[in-house]
């Protein structure tokens, strides 16, 4: 996995890199735009508009919520990505921190109508994902929802086929979801 310095270096070309991967239907961002659009519609359908974004990157999705008048909160571990996102959303409350170690205290002091995690949870082991998601649930308002968009596969076979097709582009440090076939 890239460390925060790696993401800082990638930040200025991140949006273009994601777009090219999606346009070419290539790992890891194949289907990115469609997933983000679907998630965007679901979040806006929520009754309130306090949104927490975990690992928001350059703010591709989060800035769309911001433009619709949502109150934006977020945590990312790349200072450069935060800088780029903050320029798109001057009033957003964005914090730097490694969410694998938990949220910064300022974010834990709020409650949210929607918590969004896109292309971020794959940095956690399955056990860490479960613990982190459990820690997020009390931060949701009564009718709040948690939305996850990430690389995932219907079967282990699909995951292995993608790994083979991606070749040297495959990031073996990332932990993607795929159910195990029954034996």
Place the predicted regions along the sequence by residue.
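Conserved class I S-adenosyl-L-methionine
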Residues: 1-45
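Short catalytic micro-motifs in class I SAM-dependent methyltransferases
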Residues: 119-120
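A short glycine-rich, Lys/Arg-flanked "PGG" loop and its adjoining helix->strand segment in the class I
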Residues: 130-142
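Short conserved loop adjoining the S-adenosyl-L-methionine
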Residues: 101-109
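A conserved beta-strand element that flanks and buttresses the S-adenosyl-L-methionine
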Residues: 116
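Class I SAM-dependent methyltransferase SAM/SAH-binding core
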Residues: 52, 58-102
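Phosphate-coordination loops involved in phosphoryl transfer and adenosine-cofactor binding
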Residues: 48
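C-terminal alpha-helical "lid/dimerization" subdomain adjacent to the S-adenosyl-L-methionine
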Residues: 148-183
């Amino acid at each position: 996995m890239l460390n925060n310095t790696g993401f800082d270096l990638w930040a200025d070309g991140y949006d273009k890199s994601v777009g090219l991967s999606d346009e070419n239907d290539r790992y890891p961002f194949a289907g990115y735009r469609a997933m983000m659009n679907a998630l965007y519609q679901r979040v806006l359908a929520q009754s309130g508009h306090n949104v927490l974004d975990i690992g928001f990157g350059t703010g591709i999705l989060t800035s769309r919520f911001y433009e619709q008048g949502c109150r934006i909160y977020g945590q990312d571990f790349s200072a450069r990505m935060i800088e780029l996102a903050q320029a798109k959303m001057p009033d957003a409350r964005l914090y730097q921190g490694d969410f694998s170690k938990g949220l910064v205290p300022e974010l834990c002091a709020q409650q949210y109508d929607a918590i969004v995690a896109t292309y971020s949870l794959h940095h956690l082991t399955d056990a860490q994902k479960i613990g982190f998601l459990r820690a997020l649930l009390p931060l949701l308002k009564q009718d709040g929802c948690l939305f996850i968009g990430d690389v995932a596969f219907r079967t282990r076979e699909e995951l292995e086929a993608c790994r083979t097709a991606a070749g040297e582009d495959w990031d073996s440090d990332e932990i993607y979801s795929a159910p195990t076939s029954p034996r």
